């Protein structure tokens, strides 16, 4: 009987040693997203519950607007970001100013600045990398496959439209409630989107970046369609207000009131909705222009 009790105790001890110790559950991530496309991608990956703060460009989906704001991406406050106790800050290349980013690093907050690039492939790469940062590799691969399939369909549609009509000369106008209107040259998000949609940027050969709109230059390039953001068009008083800008009313686009406007983040954000943006833009600029 004594040996039996000893064996039982030994067996129980052995089982206790073999049983796995309960592990502490990892604390949830607290992500601050600085960039509308980054926020949009986090939602597409299903990581929205880990978001604790966003910047003012994070307008899609609508639920993102209910999150605490850290302000404008280019004018961040270190105190504002740190007050949200983030365990990860993900930002686009436009985030700043640099002293604020250095302050975040000095506070030992993990900061990842994602590469920009106005290409479809760059958007996919950013999405996959963002998924890896959130421990959502499978969701990242699924999202990549989804947008690639959409992109293939869109490219085929744009090619078909380009065969049916002459690619139009398009002018992208960036406007705000205050300040002079600017037009897009090459090496801009607008230039890339116009090209993907099958249009020719009216200032694509003239200069890089954005420059103030001047009547002489606009009349000289004779755009057939004007592209703007919905926010910019509203700020200038709609189509009527936009065409009051010197020179625009004298262009072919102005004379026919050919103005196409898309929501800013959709058009210029280079997020997961990029195929949708290109498809919408292409249909709008090609439909009324038969060969």
Locate each region found by the language model:
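A ligand-binding cleft/hinge motif common to bilobed small-molecule-binding domains
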Residues: 97-106, 225-243
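His/Asp/Glu-enriched short active-site or ligand-binding loop at hydrolase and phosphoryl-transfer sites
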Residues: 184-210, 230
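N-terminal export signals
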Residues: 2-5, 10-26
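Short secondary-structure boundary segments
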Residues: 35, 93-94, 116, 206, ...
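Alpha-to-beta junction loops
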Residues: 85-89, 199, 221-226
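A short, structured surface patch at a secondary-structure boundary
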Residues: 29-100, 202
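Short helices/loops that flank or line small-molecule/ion binding pockets
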Residues: 79-85, 213-222
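Extracytoplasmic substrate-binding proteins
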Residues: 27-30, 99-178, 201-204, 208, ...
């Amino acid at each position: 009987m004594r040996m039996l009790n000893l064996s039982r105790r030994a067996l129980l001890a052995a089982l206790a040693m073999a049983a796995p110790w309960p592990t502490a559950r990892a604390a949830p991530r607290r992500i601050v997203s600085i960039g509308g496309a980054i926020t949009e991608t986090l939602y597409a990956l299903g990581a929205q519950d880990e978001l604790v703060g966003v910047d003012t460009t994070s307008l899609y989906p609508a639920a993102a607007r209910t999150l605490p704001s850290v302000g404008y991406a280019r004018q961040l406050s270190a105190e504002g970001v740190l007050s949200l106790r983030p365990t990860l800050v993900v930002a686009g290349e436009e985030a700043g100013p640099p002293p604020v980013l250095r302050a975040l690093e000095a506070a030992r907050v993990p900061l990842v600045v994602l590469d920009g690039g106005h290409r479809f492939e760059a958007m996919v790469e950013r999405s996959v990398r963002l998924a890896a940062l959130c421990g959502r590799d499978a969701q990242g691969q699924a999202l990549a496959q989804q947008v690639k399939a959409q992109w293939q369909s869109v490219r085929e549609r744009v090619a078909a439209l380009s065969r049916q009509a002459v690619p139009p000369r398009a002018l992208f106008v960036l406007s705000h409630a205050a300040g002079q209107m600017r037009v897009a040259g090459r090496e801009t998000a607008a230039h890339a989107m116009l090209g993907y949609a099958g249009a020719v940027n009216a200032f694509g050969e003239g200069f890089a970046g954005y420059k103030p709109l001047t009547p002489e230059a606009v009349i000289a390039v004779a755009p057939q369609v004007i592209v703007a953001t919905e926010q910019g068009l509203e700020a200038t008083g709609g189509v009527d207000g936009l065409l009051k800008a010197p020179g625009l009313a004298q262009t072919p686009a102005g004379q026919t009131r050919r103005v196409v406007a898309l929501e800013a983040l959709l058009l210029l954000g280079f997020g997961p909705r990029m195929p949708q943006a290109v498809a919408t833009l292409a249909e709008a600029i090609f439909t009324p222009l038969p060969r």
